[in-house]
Amino acid sequence: AVVMTRKEIELLCYLLTHRGQILSREHLLKNVWDSNGFVLERTVDVHITHLRKKLGQYGKRIVTKSRYGYLFSV
């Protein structure tokens, strides 16, 4: 069984809902994280890294688009 944090699940669901679309770190922070608090953009990168590891071979579907953000490839 794969154990994920609530935020990892929320991020994965958001990526899946918007699969095929490039989503910037800023966009992900606004839509997945609580915008009331201060959150660093690096937080997205860390969560993406954890998701990729936990998804194993399927983690490769989360693609980094340099200087743009991330997308879940279909």
Descriptions of predicted regions:
Residues A1-G59, T64-S66:
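Positively charged, aromatic-enriched patches within helix-turn-helix-type DNA-binding elements
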Residues F72-V74:
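C-terminal edge and immediately downstream basic/flexible tail or linker adjoining helix-turn-helix-like DNA-binding
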Residues G69:
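Alpha/beta-hydrolase active-site loop signature
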